Amino acid sequence: MARAKWPVAGLVAVAMAATLAAGVRAWAVTDEDVTRAVDEGRQVLLAQQSQDGSWTEEKYHGALFACGHTEMALYTLLYIGEHPNSEAIRKATDAMLARPTDYTYALSWRIMALAKLQEKLTEGLRDRAREELKKSVAVLVGGQGAHGGWDYRPIRASGYPAATQARFDLSNTQMAILALWEASQAGIEIPTSVWQRAQTLYLRLQHTDDGSWNYGDPNNMDHGANSPGYGSMTAAGLATLFITSDLLEPGSGCPCGPGRSAKARGDMNRRIDAALKWMEVNFTPDANPQCIDPTWMRLYWLYSVERVGMASGYQYFGAHNWYQEGAQSVLSTSWRTLPDLCFAMLFLYKGRAPVLYNKLQFKGEWNNHRRDIANLTSYIIKAKEQLFQWQIVGLLAPMEELHAAPILYITAETPPEFSEADKKKLREFTDTGGTILFEASCGNPAVRAWFKTFAKEVWPEWALKPLGPEHGSFLDPYRLRQRPEIFGLDDGLRTFLFYAMDDVSCAWSLKSVASREYLFRWGINLYTYATDYSPLRAKLETADSAKPSERYATPIQVGSRQRVTLARLKYDGPWATGRQYQPMERLTQFLRDRSFLTLDADEAGLEAKDLKKEDVALLVGGGGELTMSAENLEALKAYLGRGGFLWVESAGGSADFDKAVRKLAEDAGWELKPIDKTHALLTGQFPTAVGYNVATGVEFRRALRVVRLGRAYAELVGIYHNGKLIGIHSPFDILFSLTGYEAYGLRGYKVEDAMAVAVNILLYVSDPPALP
């Protein structure tokens, strides 16, 4: 695409935040910076719209009609969230459809805008958009030359013979292919020959020495002919191959043979890998690499990088995080033309999409079904009408990057060669709230045997068990009549590992929606289960991006005692439920940061008969198992008689454990009574200490939001003996809730309120009211 100045009164730019000034690290850019820039860019686009709905146009390369600024602006506004029924969109659509276009770029952007419009319009307007879409697609398809490429104007309309000598270039061609792909996603049928001709052209023109592409025009000595490949054309060429290979050769490695994948087409994979290697070696966000003029079409280059990153799942090209570095570069740049502004907006907006699945790269056969998660993600995008992406990660990545997606997907066709450090990393991932989906690719028997040993080694506390039809991953949001056979590791709070001993990924790779849609729906159910419907983070958001809670606005005041000791009780049953998530470490750190109260917590597990001078005995469990020997029950009663305090919690808000606690209280001769909202445990007002007021304004996790309407206070049950409060029982989850991790159907508090309730319990122990 040739250079073009956008004739506006002043400089089109979005101001960079002060923190992003020159010299600041690339990862200083935040999602807040990105969303602010996108909104400002949207305002600039709207401000430059003419009264008739169009944008200022230019004509290039002998085109009879406008070049496509209006089409490009319309598509960009639709993509970044401008409502399709707004006046600006309505006027822009009318202006676009009121004029003809014979310019390939304009026609391509028109098709993409119409495809986007028809997704969102009401029935009558949608029908109009679809008819116009069909007409434009027919023109663009007819404009392809026999060699597979496109010129600035449709080749037949330009007077060229529909033969291999007609002029073309790969910039026009990649735009046409992108537009036709968008149309195909909107349900418009594109002749297979269109993709075949284009793919053949790209394979013919790829530089076999380094995997790159140039402009492709044999008569352009600077950018085409035999000149070296450069950034924007290589990224666009690679994105085009992803499109054509997905359409022409779906299901690389599928269907499965006995325990092994089908032989993939090695040539196409090698071509794609060569181009990806070029991207790794040459990526820079600040220039169009290897171009004669590196400043030329730099934002076009970054837009193409985003397309490759999203299609390939690569978060990094070499050592470069393409979105982080690209976003900082874009936000540091003045956008002087309408195309620059649109490319910048599309890069920023599309690249920040939340990540649904991370696919693990490891030493071994990890990618025999190369497009499995890519195709599943595409299905979910359509089903949810929301933009998502997927990524490839390795175990050398920081834990924060592994947690960028709710699911870590591991598929292996040979036993992975995990080091001891790798195994510890995977255990740390699940212990910090992560969820793993492991597949024995094609049901490989060697991987099946290896996995059983591996699971016992890394997660020895739990046994693999088949998931029954009532498991949440089979019910929500889709109630699956047909289900894959899945095993799981469940810790009493959540299933943190899902194991498919038979192949599920070939259905995704082959896009077998018609015959095996239940597997695609299970992919939606799975991330829903892992997140409990919590919103996913945008690309540059981190776990600590949330604004500080007003819950902690009032500082904690400690009473006369500044140290509390706590021990977790061991009993016959799941006494260690939730321990691996280290809630006590978080609670200890919170108190250290915000008060002078020191918590010494021993979670190794003590039987009641071994309790001595601990201030608090913590009794946690999930399910209905709570069996304590007569010796330990008497020891617990004696401990409480000496002034100890019992903190009982139904992990996950388990109703069955709540019943077991009531049976234990009956056996021990204790009385259970609800704690009144005026009690210090809820008001946070102790004799000398001050905690948090959880008698009002308390927020709950999803499973309790409706049932607690009108009851926005913490719920604690007092454990009494002879009228004295000797402990509390929480029927709702506190400890797991305060970690901030997610568990499907968890009956607990939002993070801040869970922490506040826990703090109040400890403050009560450190500063109890005087006995009457």
Regions found by a protein language model. Name each.
Residues 1-13:
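Bacterial N-terminal signal peptides that target proteins for export
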Residues 10-22:
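Bacterial N-terminal signal peptides
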Residues 27-40, 54-88, 99-196, 204-325, ...:
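An alpha-helical repeat/solenoid feature that recognizes helix-turn-helix modules
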Residues 75, 110-112, 141, 149-151, ...:
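Structural recognition of the beta-strand scaffold that forms the well-ordered cores
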Residues 80-83, 101-104, 116-119, 146-148, ...:
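Solvent-exposed loop/turn segments at secondary-structure junctions
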Residues 167-169, 407-448, 616-658:
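Short alpha-beta junction capping motif
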Residues 350-407, 411-414, 504, 511-616, ...:
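Aromatic-Pro/Gly-enriched surface loop or interdomain linker
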Residues 444-531, 542, 549-550, 562-565, ...:
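An acidic, glycine-rich "communication" segment
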